């Protein structure tokens, strides 16, 4: 492996051990199109109590928005949105004219219009979430002051859909994507 990770192959299976977190692409016979992505995240250190006020908790399982047409969760100020490991959310998250909102966890956003849509807001954070097959941008930001994106994973087979599009934003920090 290019990262120097030792591995063995037995009966069409690859075995390896990791001693630290990392993001890996496993490519068989140099096939970069049909690869396997492995995300070895650090253990979660912050799991909010689902009963705490200001917490929107998505437990393991499938979740759809209840809005019409059923494609968006609108988030209020001073909220922590937690996607637990095994949580699959089928919809985008909207923050408009809000502040102090965090999206954390190891869950997935699957097939949304966009993963995240932030406008006219302050102090927004994304950490650890994976977005799969959005129809458009993974993160769309407009006039956001204080946006932190860390350990975001995004995949899509659709055009213009796996990126971060920011317009008139300031104090933006993007790392480990």
PLM features per residue range, with description:
Residues 1-177:
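Extracellular/periplasmic carbohydrate-active domains that bind, remodel
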